[in-house]
Design a protein with these regions (language model features):
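Canonical tetratricopeptide repeat
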Residues: 103, 136-143, 177, 216, ...
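Register position in tetratricopeptide repeats
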Residues: 76, 110-111, 150, 184-185, ...
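N-terminal leader/linker segments that initiate helical-solenoid repeat arrays
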Residues: 48-102, 110-119, 329
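Conserved structural position within tetratricopeptide repeats
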Residues: 89-92, 126, 163-166, 200, ...
Length: 329
């Protein structure tokens, strides 16, 4: 959203004024000047309007909006460096425009200028009005949390997502992001609480986001060695509808859970599905080797283990299984 569009959205009569001022004939310049003065007076009296001040004229806003639109097009076409220049120019013209700074943060992030992006996102949040931009600020809290998590700053990530949830406990994206943060630091119980709360807010029918959260919940159950929970959580997921990496994750978690419940044939079936997608998947071949070993199918276990070590000679679990196979009965 452009700065001038933000004004039109939040100031009722500005919705009609913006197109009208473009149509006014030249002979009405005096009336226009009076009207602009009136608009400036009214806008400056509104506590929530952070985009307009006596130092920023409507002409400046319009020019900045045109520059910002140019930045939008450059960003969409992947010309991030030039887009950043446009957004910086627009931001300099309207120092209180939080929206262009939000775009600038995304552009810096696309350029891998991570710390600059985080700093700019904080500036956008500071400029946003707590009441008028309440939902927008909450979204930005979550985005800032994601940025910090991506660069490994877990404490700051948790700080920002907590702020979003404090303001809106039912904010779905915030619950999902906090779940991922807590999962990262292995606070599995707390992560499950957020993930399950997020699932309760989602529609029952399957969606890409719901499946993604279900996979993360199953992953935690897998870490906790709770195979029955893994199978229950993934039972409604059809791997054929997923991207290959997601499908492999689901098959692998199912296979491990089935092996642990001694449903060996079903486990092998899941692992074979993985090898169709990726014949060189070392972890799948290891689980296959361990499944055959538990079945007492020694020859197949040894052959599968040899494949694992060919793909990854330093696979820790495979090396332990190799020692176990070599030890006297």
């Amino acid at each position: 959203m452009l700065a001038i569009d933000h004004i039109a959205k939040n100031i009722p009569f500005a919705k009609t004024y913006v197109p009208i001022q473009r149509l006014m004939p030249t002979r009405h310049h005096k009336q226009l000047a009076v009207f602009v003065t009136l608009v400036a007076f009214v806008l400056s009296s509104l506590t929530g309007c952070r985009l307009f001040s006596s130092r920023v004229t409507l002409e400046t806003l319009t020019t900045a909006a045109e520059i910002e639109r140019g930045g939008d097009q450059l960003y969409k076409s992947g010309h991030y460096d030039t887009a950043a220049n446009r957004f910086e120019e627009a931001a300099a013209m309207v120092p209180t425009d939080q929206l262009v700074r939000r775009k600038l943060a995304d552009t810096y992030w696309a350029e891998n200028r991570y710390h600059a992006a985080i700093a700019m996102m904080r500036t956008a949040i500071d400029l946003a009005h707590p009441a008028i931009d309440r939902e927008l600020r909450q979204e930005w809290f979550v985005r800032l949390a994601e940025m910090n998590l991506d660069i490994g700053n877990v404490d700051r990530a948790l700080h920002w997502v907590d702020r979003a949830i404090e303001e809106n406990p039912q904010m779905l994206p915030a619950r999902v992001v906090r779940g991922s943060i807590l999962e990262r630091v292995q606070s599995y119980k707390a992560a499950l609480e957020d993930y399950h709360y997020a699932l309760s807010l989602m529609a029952e029918e399957s969606s890409a986001e719901r499946v993604r959260v279900e996979i993360e919940v199953a992953r935690i159950y897998s870490h906790q060695r709770r195979p029955h929970r893994v199978l229950a959580m993934t039972s409604a997921i059809d791997p054929r509808t997923l991207q290959p990496t997601q499908a492999i994750d689901v098959h692998l978690m199912r296979a491990t859970a089935l092996r642990d419940r001694q449903r060996f044939a079903d486990a092998v079936g899941e692992l074979q599905q993985i090898l169709v997608l990726d014949t060189n998947h070392a972890q799948a071949r290891f689980v296959l080797a361990s499944t055959y070993w538990q079945q007492r199918d020694i020859v197949r276990a040894q052959n599968s283990l040899a494949e694992v070590l060919r793909l990854n000679p330093n696979h820790p679990a495979a090396l332990r299984l190799q020692q176990q196979m070599a030890s006297p009965k």
